[in-house]
Regions:
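Non-catalytic pre-domain segments flanking phosphatase-related domains
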Residues: 1-32
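Amphipathic coiled-coil/heptad-repeat helices and related helical stalk/stem segments
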Residues: 15, 48-49, 93, 118
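Conserved Lys-Pro-Asp/Glu-containing loop-to-beta segment of HAD-superfamily phosphomonoesterases
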Residues: 94-119
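Bateman/CBS regulatory modules and CBS-like beta-alpha motifs in cytosolic regions of diverse proteins
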Residues: 1-9, 69, 91-97
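Short, structured coil segments at secondary-structure junctions
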Residues: 80-82
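Short, flexible loop segments at the rims of nucleotide/cofactor-binding pockets, characterized by
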Residues: 6-10, 39-43, 63-64, 87-91
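Short active-site oxyanion
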Residues: 60-64, 85, 109-111
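Substrate-recognition element of Asp-dependent hydrolases with the DxDx(T/V) motif
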Residues: 30-32, 37-44, 49-78
């Protein structure tokens, strides 16, 4: 019953993920948490995050930030990476995961979620 709460893969850092392989495997959308997933809590997008999103766009991914934070925090990060975003997402409720996939034009079979928390992401 609780298996759906656990990730398929654990990584030490978002920046270790082989996104080219994910694309080759048929994934087309990536939903990201922000804090402690892409940057430290409350930090703006750094050069590493900006480069990552540029690379993801080059590969062909659609991306969406999904955060329980308020809009000013999410917008501050997104101003540097320019992707879809949803703030005040009420994770782990599935409603805004579905909305993110709608924004990206993907579905649950072609979308990956990347976050740092088991029960809130």
């Amino acid at each position: 019953m609780f298996q759906k709460f656990y990730p398929d893969v654990y990584m030490d850092s978002t920046y270790e993920i082989d996104f080219e392989q994910l694309y080759q495997d048929g994934y087309r959308g990536i939903i990201f948490d922000i804090d402690n997933t892409l940057v430290t809590h409350g930090a703006p997008a750094d050069t590493r995050a900006i480069a990552l999103f540029a690379e993801l766009k080059r590969i062909g991914f659609q991306c969406c930030l999904l955060s329980n934070n308020k809009e000013p925090r999410v917008k501050m990060f997104n101003d540097s990476v320019h992707v879809n975003y949803i703030y005040d997402a009420h994770k782990p409720s599935v409603q805004n995961y579905k909305k993110a996939m709608e924004l990206m034009g993907t579905d649950k079979n072609s979308t990956v979620f990347i976050g740092d928390q088991i029960f809130t992401d």
